[in-house]
């Protein structure tokens, strides 16, 4: 069976540095940080009192007010980015076979804000007997965003959620890619969203010592590959890609951002939360993606790394890149856009895939901000080009995006410039 080619025809993003794809990209290229004091709850007694929040998000711009009240913030973000991506794709819902359009959209955590609110209310009032919102469960569960998007458009194709912590939305893109190239759908709306900047989310990650505590300077806290890094910065938001079978896209005259070349998945099988110190899972996932794409490592121009600004993770990923790419590792560009957006958890892969695609489209590699001269880690080879502090113009024909999640879940997707 000949596999079909898959292209990207629509993009949607709401992030801490922009509430649309154009705004997101402009701020990435300009090295703008989305970090600031937490406003979603009173974090004054927390070790970490800052995060990368989405600013000025009004769900009612995208959803009827009554329907919005039935959704957790993570689902509201999902619906909003799906609307941008579907509109951007130019899909004519009236003319399409909706049985051949699917939705694969995930969250690493899901409705934690709803869970906190409902369980908190119960704890306060339990002597009066249980009283829960009838929408508690559907607001909380991590699959509901995919369901809401399909209901909104009437898409009857493959529909489910992925959940693999921070690899979630890359897995969603990978599944969409595989289903389309096998002929199971004409198009799939794929991606992820997350809204876990809440007391349980921040408190839980603080308890693990996973978050930066650079409270005096939030905008400089996310500093991947710098010696003074002290943990990741929580972010929130959503990213959505419309993946489409090439001939279907061409037949309707769709614009094509890029082609999906290949995907890879692997497991560290090492630790619940820490990546393998030698980067074994990271190495394997990149090799798997390159094999799937039938691509030589020397063809890759840009890697959007997982690069969370954690002490162990950044070292292991840098090691893996050197092992996979050899001498070419010093020729390609590497950057972590998490230095600006923070870590969007389940939404990270989709948002970073969009950054990778726009690097191809625009010939610009966004920077890794916040690196200071002399702030070098002896365990990291700075002959690698981490694109520190300033975007770089270069031709990008092939971009690779890594995402690694708690539990040892690793996912990688490769995009390439579309050509007939």
Regions found by a protein language model. Give the residues of each.
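Condensing-enzyme catalytic core mediating Claisen C-C bond formation in acyl metabolism
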Residues: 5-9, 36, 216-293, 302, ...
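ACP-dependent fatty acid/polyketide chain-elongation machinery
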Residues: 1-67, 247-257, 354-368, 416-420
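Conserved small-residue
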Residues: 10, 28, 82, 103, ...
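Active-site-proximal alpha-helical scaffold in enzymes
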Residues: 78-91, 145, 150-153, 158-194, ...
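Acyl-CoA/ACP chain-elongation machinery
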Residues: 39, 184-230, 263-277, 307-314, ...
């Amino acid at each position: 069976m000949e596999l079909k080619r898959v292209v990207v025809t629509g993009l949607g993003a709401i992030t801490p540095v922009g509430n649309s794809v154009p705004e997101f990209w402009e701020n990435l290229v300009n090295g703008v940080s989305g970090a600031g004091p937490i406003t979603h709850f009173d974090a004054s007694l927390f070790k970490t009192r800052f995060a990368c929040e989405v600013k000025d998000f009004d769900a009612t711009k995208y959803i009827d007010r009554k329907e919005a009240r039935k959704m957790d913030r993570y689902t509201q973000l999902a619906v909003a980015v799906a609307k941008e991506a579907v509109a951007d794709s130019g899909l004519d819902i009236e003319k399409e076979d909706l049985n051949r359009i699917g939705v694969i959209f995930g969250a690493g955590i899901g409705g934690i804000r709803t869970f906190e609110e409902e369980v908190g209310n119960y704890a306060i009032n339990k002597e009066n007997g249980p009283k829960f919102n009838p929408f508690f469960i559907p607001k909380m569960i991590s699959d509901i965003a995919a369901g809401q998007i399909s209901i909104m458009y009437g898409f009857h194709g493959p529909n489910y959620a992925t959940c693999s912590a921070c690899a979630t939305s890359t897995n969603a893109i990978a599944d969409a890619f595989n289903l389309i190239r096998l002929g199971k759908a004409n198009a799939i709306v794929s991606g992820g969203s997350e809204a876990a900047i809440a007391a349980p989310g921040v408190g839980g990650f603080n308890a693990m010592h996973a978050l930066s505590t650079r409270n005096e300077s939030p905008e400089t806290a996310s500093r991947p590959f710098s010696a003074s890094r002290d943990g990741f910065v929580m972010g929130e938001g959503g990213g959505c890609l419309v993946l489409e079978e090439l001939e279907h896209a061409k037949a309707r005259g769709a614009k094509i951002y890029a082609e999906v070349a290949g995907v890879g998945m692997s497991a560290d099988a090492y630790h619940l939360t820490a990546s393998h110190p030698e980067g074994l899972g990271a190495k394997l996932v990149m090799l798997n993606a390159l094999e799937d794409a039938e691509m030589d490592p020397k063809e890759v121009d840009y890697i959007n790394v997982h690069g969370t600004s954690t002490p162990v993770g950044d070292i292991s990923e840098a090691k893996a890149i050197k092992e996979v790419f050899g001498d070419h590792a010093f020729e390609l560009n590497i950057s972590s856009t998490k230095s600006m957006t923070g870590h969007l958890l389940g939404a990270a892969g989709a948002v970073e895939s969009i950054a990778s695609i726009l690097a191809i489209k625009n010939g610009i590699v966004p920077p890794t901000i916040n690196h200071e001269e002399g702030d070098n880690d002896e365990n990291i080879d700075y002959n690698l080009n981490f694109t520190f502090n300033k975007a770089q113009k270069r031709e990008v024909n092939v971009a690779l995006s890594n995402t690694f999640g708690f539990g040892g879940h690793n996912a990688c997707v490769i995009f390439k410039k579309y050509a007939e």
